[in-house]
Amino acid sequence: MNRHKAREKAFQVLFQLDINETELEEVMETLKEKERYDVFLRSLVEGVIQHKSVIDEKISTHLEKWTIDRIASVERTILRMAILEIMYIDDIPQNVSINEAIELAHTFGDEQSGKFVNGVLSKIIA
């Protein structure tokens, strides 16, 4: 599976975990078997879970007149994934992480999601 597809699947898993009180393995079981064992997909999901408090703090310090809890689950999940890539995955250039996050926002969010995600990420990397 290519990284773009893995990001989409990781988003879906993390989104489910964010909106439902569900266990990780229960959500992972909903994926096809080959997807379940994709190394990049699992590294995104497990990385966001492991570093969630640090990632959320990073996001929170760059929000104006917002709290992380007020951000819609779609945008919050996408931001968490992008920040994980920027902070913890060295072989992905920042601009790739940002572009992929914007693409995810266009795919899964509304028409303003891409602008919001881009704005927050631009502040974080500045």
From Swiss-Prot:
Highest taxon, organism lineage: Bacteria
Record's HAMAP family? NusB (MF_00073)
* Function as written in the Swiss-Prot or TrEMBL entry: Involved in transcription antitermination. Required for transcription of ribosomal RNA (rRNA) genes. Binds specifically to the boxA antiterminator sequence of the ribosomal RNA (rrn) operons.
Task: Name the family the entry cites.
Answer: Belongs to the NusB family.
The alphabetized UniProt keywords are:
RNA-binding, Transcription, Transcription antitermination, Transcription regulation
* InterPro entries in the cross-refs: NusB-like_sf, NusB_fam, NusB_RsmB_TIM44
Q: Would you tell me the Gene Ontology cellular component terms?
A: cytosol
Protein name (database record): Transcription antitermination protein NusB
Pfam families, per database record:
NusB (PF01029)
Q: Which PANTHER family match?
A: ANTITERMINATION NUSB DOMAIN-CONTAINING PROTEIN, N UTILIZATION SUBSTANCE PROTEIN B-RELATED
- Supply one GO BP term: DNA-templated transcription termination
Q: What is the lineage of its organism?
A: Bacteria, Bacillati, Bacillota, Bacilli, Bacillales
Output one GO MF annotation.
RNA binding
